[in-house]
Amino acid sequence: MFYQLNNNMTNKPTIAAIIPAAGVGSRMQHNAPKQYIKLAGKTILEHTLTKLSALAQLNTIVVALNENDPYFEQLPVIDARIVRTCGGKERADSVLNSLLFLAANPPDWVLVHDAARPLVTIDDINTLINECISADEGGILASKVKDTIKRGHIYAEQTVPRDDLWQALTPQFFKYEDLKNALQNALASGAVITDEASAIEWANKPVKLIPGRSDNIKITTPEDLDLAGFLLQKQQNENAL
């Protein structure tokens, strides 16, 4: 599909969003992939796309889908900036495919967000973008670990100090070239890449930790879907005040 980033001939950095959405979400025990499960009358992916579409600073929003995805084209058109490309076997493959899709007219920065995190707030995303651009460094939304963490298998073997532990959230925001090069090289080396930050860390580049709201949950299990419904209603009530 042809598209063109719109930088309006200004000095503002161009930003593209990437949503890896090629997974099947087997833990949801549902016929459709989890991003197409309904939450308060809309699919999870619709909620996520609607949230990102509220960000005027995004030039394009790339959704990486399974090649045989039959659901996406059935969704209502939310924003003309949304385009699709083919995802890969793993999340990192989908993100790299999206980066290569953008290569003909690359943005300055990319914002990668989980399809199954529809509860992220606009305020958190703007804080992430502004702090990273101001520092000229990539970063991620993250939440300080509050629970006691144990290491073990069947039995607890060790309590892990949590003073410097953070739970990585999304979006994750990095310079386009930094992330593309880091992912390409890390995957070629056989490194296990679980999120974009892990690729940047592998490349020995800094990753800023930007505190984000703990209700920015990833919907992975049926229990998460119930919790997301409650949290969505709570957010809507907050916004109505």
Swiss-Prot record:
GO terms for biological process: isopentenyl diphosphate biosynthetic process, methylerythritol 4-phosphate pathway. CDD domains: CDP-ME_synthetase (cd02516). GO terms for molecular function: 2-C-methyl-D-erythritol 4-phosphate cytidylyltransferase activity. It comes from the Bacteria. Pfam families: IspD. The record marks R162, K218 as: Positions MEP for the nucleophilic attack. InterPro entries: IspD, IspD/TarI, IspD/TarI_cytidylyltransf_bact, ISPD_synthase_CS, Nucleotide-diphossugar_trans. It catalyses: 2-C-methyl-D-erythritol 4-phosphate + CTP + H(+) = 4-CDP-2-C-methyl-D-erythritol + diphosphate. The record marks R27, K34 as: Transition state stabilizer. Its EC number is 2.7.7.60. Belongs to the IspD/TarI cytidylyltransferase family. IspD subfamily. NCBIfam families: ispD. Catalyzes the formation of 4-diphosphocytidyl-2-C-methyl-D-erythritol from CTP and 2-C-methyl-D-erythritol 4-phosphate (MEP). This is 2-C-methyl-D-erythritol 4-phosphate cytidylyltransferase. The lineage of its organism: Bacteria, Pseudomonadati, Pseudomonadota, Gammaproteobacteria, Alteromonadales. The gene is ispD.
